[in-house]
Each structure stands twice: as structure tokens, then as C-alpha cells.
């Protein structure tokens, strides 16, 4: 096997909103023809377009079966709020897998979490669950089309640019200063490192838009007030140092004009900047 396998997990910025497959982070890393440990670097995109650390941990657990040489976990503060962990459909509809992670690795999950979709006996039958089966077969057909065309999303000719002017609002998920580790799903992040085991994992704080518009002295962007994000970065540095994690903070590595319809969605040029920043870390991680 002459492939140095890199699995990239994250949100819609990794998945590639408004990007063609070759323009995504994984696509651009593959185009660079990097060589690590005498092998050709091959990056695999396991991004999924919702933001939740617990969702990412689920994907990490599935990725293990592909025996990656390196895992890159792209994340951002909005993946950490406690109330977001199980609300994403990928988690809400896979309670059994989440409970398995809780049992095996100590992932913190409430016993009575109401976000999980619980099916009754009728809903588990083929007739009662026919909508899900219809979706399943339709997606298999779509998959053939996506593979044949390389197109797996709608590319609008025009789109609304990411917001850069804001109200004078310092709020973030009802949290109050100072931000603490208890406010965030740190347990899910720790679980992710347990799940990958001996496989090296880069923890990357992904680039975000830094606005210079109205009230940008209060908010960096639509997602984050400055106070919250600044404290989050301090927490991430402290956590990584305490646990010996390889942490790469690229929060301000891409200029504001290289974002598209969101404060975390990059243009192809922005993705290229990100790939160039990450390439040296990939080359350092030979088994």
C-alpha cells in the first residue's frame, strides 16, 4: 500500500459548501501530490454539513475501519455548545451508536436526552418506515449521479455574502463571561482522541471571517462575539498543552474576502491557503 491515508472530519466548511470536489480542502491536498513516509498523501473528505463535536466523534469512530495514517479534525467554537451535541439529525437518528461510544469511551450523553429519535414498533417495520427506505434508495441513485458528474450540490450563479455588519450584541448561546471548560463539550473532544487511539490526529481551529464592518469591535462575525471566541482560543491552547495534543490554530489565516456565504465557508483560493498551511503538519506525521 503506497497510500498515506489522511481522513478529514469537520463541518460544512470541510464538506465544501459552494465548492466543487477538487476545490475542497481534501481535493486541494490531493492535487498537491504530497509525499509522506515515502507514500503518496491521499486525503478523504468526511465532512458533514452540521456543526457538532459529537457528530464528529461518530464519524471518527467509523473512519477507524479505513486504517488512516493521520486524522485531521477541523473544528470551531460553534461545535462545542452543550445543547448542539445531539440535535443534529446524524446524531439524533443514531442513538445506539452514541450510547455505544458512551459505554466504550465515556462520551457524556444524558440518559433522557429528548433529541434522540425513538421509533415505536410500527415505525420500525418496513411499511411504517417506508419514507426512510424511499430516501435510502433515492440517495443510492443520487450517489451514482454524483459519482458520474462530480457534482453533489447546487451551485448558484449568485449568493448572499457572509454578513459583516452586526448589532451591538455580545450574546452567545446564553453563556456569560468568563467562558469555562464546563460551558463546552470538552468531553466529546477528549472522546475523539480516545477513539482514534494510536493514530495521530491534528486538532485544527478552522479559519473564520474577521469582519471590519459595523460593530466588528464587538463581534468577529455572525457566529462569535469577541469575548467568547478569545476565551475559547485560550481554553483550546490550555487543553492541548495539558493533554499533549497537536493543535493548529488557523483562525485568522484567511482574509475576509476569501469567504463566501458564511463566516466559515471558504472560496477555492481560501481553501488553497488552508491546504498550504496544513501541508507541513501532514508531512511531519509519519507513523
Where are these regions (language model features)?
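Serine-dependent acyl-ester chemistry module
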Residues: 79-237, 255-256
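Catalytic His-Asp segment of secreted/periplasmic serine-dependent ester chemistry enzymes
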Residues: 210-287
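Helix C-cap/helix->beta junction micro-motif
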Residues: 33, 66, 197-199, 243
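Hydrophobic anchor at the start of a short beta-strand
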Residues: 41-43, 201, 245
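Solvent-exposed, polar/charged alpha-helical surfaces in well-ordered, non-transmembrane soluble domains
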Residues: 27, 31, 61, 187-194, ...
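Second-shell loop/turn segments in exported
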Residues: 12-19, 45-49, 178-180, 223-226, ...
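Residue-level recognition of beta-strand->loop/alpha-helix junctions
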Residues: 45-47, 205-207, 249-252
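Membrane-embedded segments
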Residues: 1-85
Amino acid at each position: 500500500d503506497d497510500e498515506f491515508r489522511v481522513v478529514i472530519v469537520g463541518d460544512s466548511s470541510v464538506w465544501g459548501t459552494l465548492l466543487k470536489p477538487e476545490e475542497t480542502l481534501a481535493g486541494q491536498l490531493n492535487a498537491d501530490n504530497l509525499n509522506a513516509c515515502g507514500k503518496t498523501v491521499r486525503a478523504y473528505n468526511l465532512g458533514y454539513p452540521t456543526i457538532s463535536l459529537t457528530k464528529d466523534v461518530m464519524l471518527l469512530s467509523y473512519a477507524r475501519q479505513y486504517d488512516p495514517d493521520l486524522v485531521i479534525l477541523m473544528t470551531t467554537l460553534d461545535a462545542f455548545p452543550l445543547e448542539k451535541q445531539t440535535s443534529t439529525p446524524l446524531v439524533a437518528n443514531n442513538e445506539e451508536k452514541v450510547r455505544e461510544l458512551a459505554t466504550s469511551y465515556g462520551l457524556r450523553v444524558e440518559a433522557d436526552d429528548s433529541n434522540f429519535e425513538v421509533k415505536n414498533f410500527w415505525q420500525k417495520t418496513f411499511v411504517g418506515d417506508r419514507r426512510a427506505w424511499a430516501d435510502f434508495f433515492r440517495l443510492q441513485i443520487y450517489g451514482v449521479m454524483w459519482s458520474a458528474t462530480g457534482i453533489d450540490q447546487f451551485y448558484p450563479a449568485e449568493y448572499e455574502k457572509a454578513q459583516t455588519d452586526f448589532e451591538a450584541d455580545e450574546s452567545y448561546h446564553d453563556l456569560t463571561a468568563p467562558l469555562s471548560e464546563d460551558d463546552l463539550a470538552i468531553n466529546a473532544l477528549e472522546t475523539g482522541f480516545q477513539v482514534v487511539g494510536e493514530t495521530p490526529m491534528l486538532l485544527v481551529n478552522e479559519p473564520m471571517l474577521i469582519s471590519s464592518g459595523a460593530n466588528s469591535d464587538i463581534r468577529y462575525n455572525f457566529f462569535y462575539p469577541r469575548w467568547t471566541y478569545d476565551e475559547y482560543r485560550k481554553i483550546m491552547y490550555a487543553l492541548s498543552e495539558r493533554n499533549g495534543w497537536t493543535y493548529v490554530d488557523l483562525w485568522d489565516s484567511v482574509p475576509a474576502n476569501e469567504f463566501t456565504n458564511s463566516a466559515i465557508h471558504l472560496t477555492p483560493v481560501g481553501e488553497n491557503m488552508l491546504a498550504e498551511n496544513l501541508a507541513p503538519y501532514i508531512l511531519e506525521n509519519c507513523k
